[in-house]
Amino acid sequence: PLRRQRQMCIRDRLFTIGEVVVHSYGVFVTLGLLAAVVSFLWELKRRDDSFWIGVDILLLMISAGLLGAKLFHVLFSLSDYQEGPHTILSLIFSGWSAAGGLLGSLLALVIYFRKKGLDGWYWMDTLIPSVPLAQTIMRVGCLMTGCCYGKPTHLPWAITFTKSTVAPLGVPLHPTQAYHLAANLLIYLFLTIRKKRSAFPGELTLAYVLFYTIQRSVIDVFRADPGRLWLWDTITTYQLIGTIAVIVVIFLYRSRMRTVS
């Protein structure tokens, strides 16, 4: 029954600076990045690694991640930025793609590690636990904004948005934002526990890619937001990429295990 479902009255726009709107999503993106920075620097200290290499990695990861996240969002949401010049400035504070940010960061870091001759697997394992921590916090912004919303449902834990510029109003929906949040939190906890006894350099990175792509592909089944591309009216691009990623991860995992043994 509807009375048992969660009513979500959100605050998407926190305040404005002139014509620039500061969105709650942008604030939680910032908080997520700050948490990732603190987590990564703490891990650097624990491993007694080079601080300045860590700073290079952080700056590259954040800049490439933000660029990738923004480009992916704009690519799939061009109509959102055709109202006038002020919407270009609002790009800074709203509209991001988690998958785009992940791909942008990974690509930039692979190039950096090869150029510097660093052990990419080792450094990625140092960095990777901070990524799902950031994503967990960022998903709070998704929930407040109403983006990444789910399909209609009458399950007891459905949520109903009463104020949103993105999600349908007055309709009980799957809380897919909360699904993502919980999944990312579990991934973070697993990596945090596993990092002290990983079997080989790169295991944490491969585990993250595996679990992230699986949770994203599964939760995509329950999502209804339009910011996704469908292939053959059957699967989303994320599900296709996720399937390929799982195959690649399994191959790399077996290869790394043979190298260690």
What positions do the PLM features span?
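Helix-hairpin-helix/helix-loop-helix acidic hairpins
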Residues: L103-S130, Y188-K196
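Gly/Gly-Pro- and Ser/Thr-rich, intrinsically disordered tail segments characteristic of DNA damage-repair
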Residues: R11-E83
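Membrane-interface capping segments at transmembrane-helix boundaries
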Residues: W42-R46, G117, K196-S198, L252-S261
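Active-site beta-strand/loop microenvironment that shapes enzyme catalytic pockets
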Residues: G65-L67, L71, Y122-L155, F161, ...
